[in-house]
Amino acid sequence: MKLMIASDLHGSAFYCRQLLAAMEREQPDKLLLLGDILYHGPRNDLPEGYAPKEVIAMLNPLRERLLCVRGNCDTEVDQMVLDFPILADYALLYAGSRAVFATHGHHYNTACLPPLAKGDILLHGHTHVPAWQEFGSGNLYLNPGSAAIPKENSAHSYMMLTDSGFAWKDLEGSIYHTLALDCSNCG
């Protein structure tokens, strides 16, 4: 499966359009959104092109191609206007033989780990900072950064997961990091 992974749109129609243009170029089987879809939250400035109703109108027609987890800014009210589920705290996926625990990052993160076996992957957004680091027993922590409000001078970005591994890209599609799926250290 070819999976596109993005996080933290925070209601930006401007960056949602760019993400969906990247989706059109990439042609993934699914788009995994790691939370904070419509609301910007009290700690963030309004993102460029803040228009949650436009984001709703862009995402609802794609409901069959979307997988989502709940972010700390996502609420039951958001779920009422979206035609796809967004309120799960996490999703379990697979990248080759490795389990991927996908979550937003405000509950489960490297400081508060979910149950992970040797070689499993923790994937979350929330920080708005792209990340790829090994920890524990061959585990990986991965973060796509933010499509709309990147922090620490990072790019507006997303990730791709293919059979060969992960690639971090800016919204124009330029690759700035790759990580091969090497399971020699996996369970």
PLM regions: where:
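Conserved beta-sheet core of the metallophosphoesterase superfamily
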Residues: 84, 88, 99, 106-179
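Amphipathic repeat-derived elements
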Residues: 1-13, 28-30, 93, 141, ...
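Long, contiguous hydrophobic alpha-helical segments, chiefly transmembrane helices and signal peptides
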Residues: 9, 51, 102-105, 147
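Generic structural signal for conserved hydrophobic packing positions in ordered secondary structure
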Residues: 59, 93, 102-104, 145
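Core catalytic region of metal-dependent phosphoesterases/phosphodiesterases
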Residues: 2-95
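Alpha-helical architecture
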Residues: 6, 70-72, 102, 124, ...
